[in-house]
Amino acid sequence: MAFTNEQMERYSRHIILQEVGVKGQKKLLNGKVLIIGAGGLGAPAAMYLAAAGVGTIGIVDADEVDLSNLQRQIIHGTADVGKAKVKSAKETMNAMNPDVTVNTYREFVTSENIMDLIKDYDFIIDGTDNFPAKFLINDACVMAKKPFSHAGIIRFKGQLMTYVPGEGPCYRCVFKNPPPKDAVPTCKQAGVIGAMGGVIGSLQAMEAIKYLLGVGDLLTGKLLTFDALKMEFHTVKLPKADHKCAICGDHPTITQLIDYEQIECPDH
C-alpha cells in the first residue's frame, strides 16, 4: 500500500518518529479498535484514534446525545443533542479523517452480543461507567483472548490499566466481583470534572496505538491513577495474574457470560 501525498503530509509527524515511520503508520491504518461507550472516555479516545489514522474504529453506544454530556464528551456538539451518539461520533470522525472506516453499533453490550461485537477487532477500549459492563467486557475479552484498556473516572480522579492475554492480571484478578448495586456512585450521581475524560481517554487511545505499533510499555500488570486536585500520577504494580481467578485462572469457574444487572448507563 503506497501512501498518497496527502496521507504523507497528514501523518508526517508520525512518520518522522523512529518508533512509527511509514511501516508503523501502515500498521495503524490496518488496525481495528472497538470503543465501548461514546462518552467522556470514548469521545477523546475516538478522536485521537481517528486523527492517528487507525483504519477501522467501532463505536458501541445505545444512547442519544444529552445537553449534560457536552461538558466533557467533546466528540458531540450542541447541534447533536437528541442525535444517536454513535451517529454523532461517526460524523465527527469522518469529518476529521476520511481514511478511517467507522462502524457504529447502537446497542448496549450484553452477554448475548458482546462476543460478536469484539470478534473482528484487535484492541478494545472500555469507556463505560458501570461495574456490570466493566466485568462483562473483561470476561468477554479474556474468553476471546482480546487485549483491552480499562479506565474509570469520577470527580477529580481517574485510573486505567491494560490487559493483554498472558501478560498480566485481568480486571477480575484485581477487583474480583462487581460491588453491590448502587454501592458506588456513577458520574451522574457524583459528578466529574470534564477534562478528566480527556486526560484518561487520551491515555486509552495511547495504549491502543502503542499496542497496534508494538512499541513501548503498556499498562499490563500496572494500575495508573491520576488525582487532578493534587496533580499527581501514580503507577501501582499489580499482583501477578491470580491463578484462582474465576475467569482467567487455572480452573475458571466462569464458563459462560452473564449480565449482572441491566446495563443502563453505557458511558461517562
Predicted regions and their residues:
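Adenine nucleotide-associated cytosolic modules
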Residues: 1-268
